[in-house]
């Protein structure tokens, strides 16, 4: 996992260069939003269970997926879906705090699509639930922090598409 600082420094180091204006501006932007990201992470942590509950209700609860024969039918499958959504919320929050999505590649996306396909997990429904989680989280955090967090939910959805 990298953070925005490590990413900028590693890029310059590989090129054998000092940080240029563009690199320094990236760091300034990262530091300028630090308090916003920390407050957002605290709000998400305090409300994670409700975020998941509202997201499931909004996207999945009353769809065919939860009815007999659907992929979330049976308590075990439903619980696995809830567990996965909680995992995505937590890792997206880590990425937002770091200012870098690499943790999502390393711990979520690498091999996930293939795993879901092999298990018969409907990717479309997963993306729909993540989009609902983005909406719920954005409503809770407000515009600025919601937009920041949305980048990481969108990154997960893009990786699953």
Swiss-Prot record:
Q: How is it modified after translation?
A: Contains one covalently linked phycocyanobilin chromophore.
Organism, as annotated: Aglaothamnion neglectum
According to the entry, what is the taxonomic lineage of the organism?
Eukaryota, Rhodophyta, Florideophyceae, Rhodymeniophycidae, Ceramiales
- UniProt-listed SUPFAM superfamilies: Globin-like
* Keywords, in A-Z order: Antenna complex, Bile pigment, Chloroplast, Chromophore, Electron transport, Membrane, Methylation, Photosynthesis, Phycobilisome, Plastid, Thylakoid, Transport
The record's subunit annotation is:
Heterodimer of an alpha and a beta chain.
Report the function annotation for this chain.
Light-harvesting photosynthetic bile pigment-protein from the phycobiliprotein complex. Allophycocyanin has a maximum absorption at approximately 650 nanometers.
Identify the InterPro entries for this entry: Allophycocyanin_b (IPR006245), Globin-like_sf (IPR009050), Phycobilisome_asu/bsu (IPR012128), Phycobilisome_asu/bsu_sf (IPR038719)
The cellular component terms of Gene Ontology attached to this UniProt record, alphabetical and capped at eight, are: chloroplast thylakoid membrane; phycobilisome
User: PANTHER family in the record, alphabetically?
Assistant: ALLOPHYCOCYANIN BETA CHAIN, PHYCOBILISOME 32.1 KDA LINKER POLYPEPTIDE, PHYCOCYANIN-ASSOCIATED, ROD 2-RELATED
Q: Chief localization class?
A: plastid
Q: Where in the cell is it found?
A: Plastid, Chloroplast thylakoid membrane
Give any single GO term for biological process.
photosynthesis
**Keyword Ligase appears in the UniProt entry:** no
Gene this chain is encoded by: apcB
Q: Which residues carry this modification: N4-methylasparagine?
A: 71
**Where does the chain bind (2R,3E)-phycocyanobilin?**
81
The family assignment reads: Belongs to the phycobiliprotein family.
State the membrane topology: Peripheral membrane protein
Q: Which Pfam families match?
A: Phycobilisome
Q: What is this protein called?
A: Allophycocyanin beta chain
């Amino acid at each position: 996992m990298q953070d925005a600082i490590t990413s900028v420094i590693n890029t310059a180091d590989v090129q054998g260069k000092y940080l240029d204006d563009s690199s320094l501006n990236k760091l300034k932007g990262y530091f300028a939003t630090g308090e916003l990201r920390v407050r957002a992470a605290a709000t998400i942590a305090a409300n994670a269970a409700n975020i998941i509950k509202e997201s499931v209700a909004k996207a999945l609860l009353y769809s065919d997926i939860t009815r007999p024969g659907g992929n979330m039918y049976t308590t075990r499958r439903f619980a696995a879906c809830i567990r996965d959504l909680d995992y995505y919320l937590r890792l997206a929050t880590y990425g937002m705090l770091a200012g870098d999505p690499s943790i999502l590649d390393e711990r979520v996306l690498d091999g996930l699509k293939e795993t879901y396909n092999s298990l018969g997990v409907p990717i479309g429904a997963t993306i729909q639930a993540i989009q609902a989680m983005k909406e719920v989280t954005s409503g809770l955090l407000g515009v600025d922090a919601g937009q920041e967090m949305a980048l990481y939910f969108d990154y997960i959805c893009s990786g699953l598409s």
